[in-house]
Amino acid sequence: MLRAALSLLALPLAGAAEEPTQKPESPGEPPPGLELFRWQWHEVEAPYLVALWILVASLAKIVFHLSRKVTSLVPESCLLILLGLVLGGIVLAVAKKAEYQLEPGTFFLFLLPPIVLDSGYFMPSRLFFDNLGAILTYAVVGTLWNAFTTGAALWGLQQAGLVAPRVQAGLLDFLLFGSLISAVDPVAVLAVFEEVHVNETLFIIVFGESLLNDAVTVVLYKVCNSFVEMGSANVQATDYLKGVASLFVVSLGGAAVGLVFAFLLALTTRFTKRVRIIEPLLVFLLAYAAYLTAEMASLSAILAVTMCGLGCKKYVEANISHKSRTTVKYTMKTLASCAETVIFMLLGISAVDSSKWAWDSGLVLGTLIFILFFRALGVVLQTWVLNQFRLVPLDKIDQVVMSYGGLRGAVAFALVILLDRTKVPAKDYFVATTIVVVFFTVIVQGLTIKPLVKWLKVKRSEHHKPTLNQELHEHTFDHILAAVEDVVGHHGYHYWRDRWEQFDKKYLSQLLMRRSAYRIRDQIWDVYYRLNIRDAISFVDQGGHVLSSTGLTLPSMPSRNSVAETSVTNLLRESGSGACLDLQVIDTVRSGRDREDAVMHHLLCGGLYKPRRRYKASCSRHFISEDAQERQDKEVFQQNMKRRLESFKSTKHNICFTKSKPRPRKTGRRKKDGVANAEATNGKHRGLGFQDTAAVILTVESEEEEEESDSSETEKEDDEGIIFVARATSEVLQEGKVSGSLEVCPSPRIIPPSPTCAEKELPWKSGQGDLAVYVSSETTKIVPVDMQTGWNQSISSLESLASPPCNQAPILTCLPPHPRGTEEPQVPLHLPSDPRSSFAFPPSLAKAGRSRSESSADLPQQQELQPLMGHKDHTHLSPGTATSHWCIQFNRGSRL
């Protein structure tokens, strides 16, 4: 229609353009001048019509889906066939002849490969191999049964005189027609069953049968066609043996071609790390090459491209990038959808041309009855045999759906068009019968299969992603069943699947996957990775900011009690005691506004950032540039990681420079006492916490190697990141890779977000006023064993403070710091006359508190002080602490 319409529109323009050239030119006249406009339709006719057909098909799908009620009742394939009939009628009325037909060459070489590749590539491999025995039974035995029974029944119908005498066909002709009309079409099955949404087992059995019966269909068609051309009198016994052997050659040869190209495709994508942009192209080219190679060798092309897609997906998906996977998915789906739409439209258009078919009612009705009857009978017989060996048998409802789902489509129409009229005189009758069968199965059965499924209450497919718990249990049961088969000595399906997985893990995966992809294919790490993703999503939903260690509560993390929760003061508070061992000097009660401001401050500091550059002036032919969202996410991640890794850079904590020279450790903070200097000089570290039990070794690349790396690579591997290699300290020292000057220092903390002004204010300067000291008489409280010593010392200290001399109120002056390198002298306490009493922490506690305040001044919240220690620990000094005293003044209350 489009060609005729454009031709009609082109007539006046072409005539106007050709009018000057139609005049005879005299020898003396000059040549015509420059033409402003010329109509060149014939030069762009073929690609223009292809583009228009695809555009019309796409617009038709859009129009169909505008009405949800129509698409819910009528399958899309039926609507496309009806649209093709309408367009074919319009073209026939305008041009007086059928301009467009579904040519077999166009169908087999250009329209069918995308559909089969999409089906094989995205086929659920586990479900396919679980039901492989049933699929092969229905595909091979069922197709042979349908072909021979249908052909023999039609021949018997002709011998009975129910077929018109003008249908000149013998037994071989009817067997040839039965071989092409008995095969279930994958295009029709896929178009109808995807809209019905039957359960996965039914779908994979019917669809797998439609894919794998291609080998049987091709062999039967070629063998019967050869016998027809040879003549029944010239067929020898060896020809029958060759026909049986060709069944194995065509099927196994097609599968072998597909597996070879799948191996090449997986191996090629292993080396495309630096040229990501061509990964989708390689997938389509090598898959199409497998189809053409099998077609060239007269093998099963459908089986070849199916095995190619099924065999390469695991390795290709692991090698290519995420963007390439998305491109392959949507491009493959788009090509398959367009090809399927064009096929059904051309089927409708081809049916309009009455010059290529002849009608015979007996043949048409007999064919419809026989294909339905023998299909149902074959399914029942084969299912009865299969149920003897299946753990989950197929019930009668499943058998009804399988019998009713044997749809015929464009494959049968293309094969009947390829028949030679000189060799098969009844070709026109076979064409008409094939068109009726295709229309009946696609339209009538397609319209009624959904109500039939609802009426029979067939189990539908459940579109939900399995949980991690379900996947773990499935793997567990697989290993248990394989172990049971191994114990009883029965090598069944689970045993061979386990052997194949071991072979794949040991050889194929290491050969066809790059190392980074092979590492992340481990199932345990995969589950652990998804657990981390789930925890991260849960953390973000709770309002946390990126990579913050404060307020982090994840579902998969065990609860940890903080230091404040295990202190003696909190135990007293929970038990209702009136004693306050820390003298209430660090109890800071902030207002709700201050707490809200602090939370908002940390949230904004973690979530907001200043972009480094607004525009990124880079272009590469090998990678796809990042969009704004991806670039923003990367900058946020890099900014947070840089801020948190500054502690490693400053302290050089256990850094093993494996590729560069070890750098000497810089001297830390100046020590203010001689003991600290002496301990630092001797390299002795005392009082290290639990963080120092296992050191973390960072593998850092040198700056020279970073400069020598390829600067043109603008997109890194999706699964690459910062790699932390954790080793024991003893292992690193034994290897001898760390210089002696590179000391091992305590593990740095993760830098928390910057504190607010309210959090920087010291607790005892929060304006709470003078607080009275309360001493509880209940000194026999139940205290944990590890806190008994601190409890006794604290109670004794408070009792001594609660009973000073009555005529004096001692005051303690701040002691000046001692010079470095000298011993700490015993300084007597001066007791001036002052109504207020004062108290000094012991030197060890004062130095520890001073050290902690200096090293962690940026902490948003101060931990509660530990219980007061006795004077007997004055000589104990922690490394790196000062000798200055920390003075705390308080008023004695009248309620002592």
From Swiss-Prot:
Biased amino acid composition, Basic residues: 660-672
InterPro entries: Cation/H_exchanger_CPA1, Cation/H_exchanger_TM, Na/H_exchanger_3/5, NaH_exchanger
Consequence when changing T714A: Abolishes SLC9A5 phosphorylation by CSNK2A1 and abolishes CSNK2A1-mediated binding of ARRB2
Phenotype upon changing S711A: Abolishes SLC9A5 phosphorylation by CSNK2A1 and abolishes CSNK2A1-mediated binding of ARRB2
Subcellular location: Cell membrane; Recycling endosome membrane; Cell projection, Dendritic spine membrane; Synaptic cell membrane
GO molecular function, one term: potassium:proton antiporter activity
Region (Required for interaction with ARRB2): 576-721
Regulation: ATP-depletion almost completely abolishes SLC9A5 activity. Inhibited by amiloride compounds.
Effect of S712A: Abolishes SLC9A5 phosphorylation by CSNK2A1 and abolishes CSNK2A1-mediated binding of ARRB2
Glycosylated residue positions: N199
Cytoplasmic membrane side: 1-45, 95-103, 156-173, 222-246, 298-331, 382-398, 450-896
Region (Disordered): 658-686, 701-720, 818-864
A Pfam family recorded for this sequence: Na_H_Exchanger
Reactions catalysed according to its record: Na(+)(in) + H(+)(out) = Na(+)(out) + H(+)(in)
Biased composition regions of type Polar residues, renumbered to the chain: 854-864
Extracellular side: 67-73, 125-134, 195-200, 268-276, 353-360, 420-428
GO cellular component: dendritic spine membrane; focal adhesion; membrane; neuron spine; plasma membrane; postsynaptic membrane; recycling endosome membrane; synapse
Topological category with respect to the lipid bilayer: Multi-pass membrane protein
Biological function: Plasma membrane Na(+)/H(+) antiporter. Mediates the electroneutral exchange of intracellular H(+) ions for extracellular Na(+) in 1:1 stoichiometry, thus regulating intracellular pH homeostasis, in particular in neural tissues. Acts as a negative regulator of dendritic spine growth. Plays a role in postsynaptic remodeling and signaling. Can also contribute to organellar pH regulation, with consequences for receptor tyrosine kinase trafficking.
Family per similarity comment: Belongs to the monovalent cation:proton antiporter 1 (CPA1) transporter (TC 2.A.36) family.
NCBIfam families named among the record's database cross-references: b_cpa1
Name by which UniProt lists this protein: Sodium/hydrogen exchanger 5
Phylogenetic lineage: Eukaryota, Metazoa, Chordata, Craniata, Vertebrata
